[in-house]
């Protein structure tokens, strides 16, 4: 629980956007204390700085319209708190823990400070275990870690949110734990659609949703991640459950911190980011960990400005992750969904000691084939496929079939694609890739491997297409 102080009253002395300065003649509010101000005490301010013996500076978590100098400010004496407990399941919250799903107030909860400490090293688990997603290209080439952190890196419109929601669907439907979705600075529409989709899928009972949308002040977007994390820690530490924490988008968290930094007068660092970017990100990321009794597995979408992976936001986020999934605009443009770039993505879980010799050797061979194909593309574009050696032509065929086999119809896009979603066990993925590399599908059309689940579907697809072609060819001339 956060430390509580006696309530004190002060006055507002300055307002600059979301930054509010206040004067307290008696006891100064401590850092992270919540102060209420406004005509009806409707504006919530979190204290970030003590300027001198009588003045403090804070960031408003709500809009400051109507706030004037000289208005009273009341120190609540406590930090920002979040509701924790089983009563939060199936509900949707804002940064303050208020329910925003129009289903009435939340019951059966207690309130905890959002400013917690990471688990001690002695409490952390060192066991490495793969977290299966049911998505072929991820499970084979970029396996995720149970209790680890994975990032989905990509620019605008390459499928980060779709991939994130597909993982929610696959994991919630087969895992016994709790999923918490945290929307930081994203579109209101996406949150509403996710809530409706999860409700229709029947998995909402084991989910909690927390949103700080893009139209909200930077203070709200900056703290909503801590609200969601506090809820996740309750399920991990108190109920000893497995928790899946999905964050969309961690870049918006950094962006909100940058806005706040500029408004409170800190000197900007490279590309205008706040000088404290590393500290702020670590305060969030280090609390995401697995202990001996429970685990928080986190998957985070990371927007990459202008597809520049040297951007400080992307660089600082990379250092906290056990797996990095890079989404390629080129692959998305070619229709390969999910648009995961197999050569740029990586995971520390892909080692032989973790996934086993068969999986490890296959993943290396798949990467080798795809890498050689990437090198040959320029030659093919200039001289044509016929100018390659017979061995290189066979390698190109394998690579093209692998690329198509790694595409997959998603449950969350059924209404758009018209294709039934597929979740594929890792054993089926390994079997399919091995058979492709053995050239068992050399005589199959490449389209037979596109947007399927297991490899057996390619055979069924080809049989159906062949039967239809034969029936059309056998149709008598002039027949109906």
Swiss-Prot record:
EC code: 7.1.2.2
GO molecular function terms noted in the UniProt entry: ATP binding; ATP hydrolysis activity; proton-transporting ATP synthase activity, rotational mechanism; proton-transporting ATPase activity, rotational mechanism
Entries under InterPro entries matching the protein: AAA+_ATPase (IPR003593), Alt_ATPase_F1_bsu (IPR017691), ATP-synt_VA_C (IPR055190), ATP_synth_F1_bsu (IPR005722), ATPase_alpha/beta_chains (IPR050053), ATPase_F1/V1/A1_a/bsu_N (IPR004100), ATPase_F1/V1/A1_a/bsu_N_sf (IPR036121), ATPase_F1/V1/A1_a/bsu_nucl-bd (IPR000194)
Residue sites binding ATP per the record: 154-161
SUPFAM superfamilies assigned: C-terminal domain of alpha and beta subunits of F1 ATP synthase, N-terminal domain of alpha and beta subunits of F1 ATP synthase, P-loop containing nucleoside triphosphate hydrolases
GO cellular component annotations of the record: plasma membrane; proton-transporting ATP synthase complex
CDD domains per UniProt: ATP-synt_F1_beta_C (cd18110), ATP-synt_F1_beta_N (cd18115), F1-ATPase_beta_CD (cd01133)
Mode of membrane association: Peripheral membrane protein
Catalytic activity: ATP + H2O + 4 H(+)(in) = ADP + phosphate + 5 H(+)(out)
Leading EC class: translocase
Keywords attached to this entry: ATP synthesis, ATP-binding, Cell inner membrane, Cell membrane, CF(1), Hydrogen ion transport, Ion transport, Membrane, Nucleotide-binding, Translocase, Transport
Main location: membrane
Subcellular location: Cell inner membrane
Any matching Pfam family: ATP-synt_ab_N
Gene3D superfamilies: 2.40.10.170, Bovine Mitochondrial F1-atpase, Atp Synthase Beta Chain, Chain D, domain 3, P-loop containing nucleotide triphosphate hydrolases
NCBIfam families per record: alt_F1F0_F1_bet, atpD
Subunit structure: F-type ATPases have 2 components, CF(1) - the catalytic core - and CF(0) - the membrane proton channel. CF(1) has five subunits: alpha(3), beta(3), gamma(1), delta(1), epsilon(1). CF(0) has four main subunits: a(1), b(1), b'(1) and c(9-12).
Primary role: Produces ATP from ADP in the presence of a proton gradient across the membrane. The catalytic sites are hosted primarily by the beta subunits.
Annotated family: Belongs to the ATPase alpha/beta chains family.
The protein's name in its UniProt record: ATP synthase subunit beta 1
Gene: atpD1
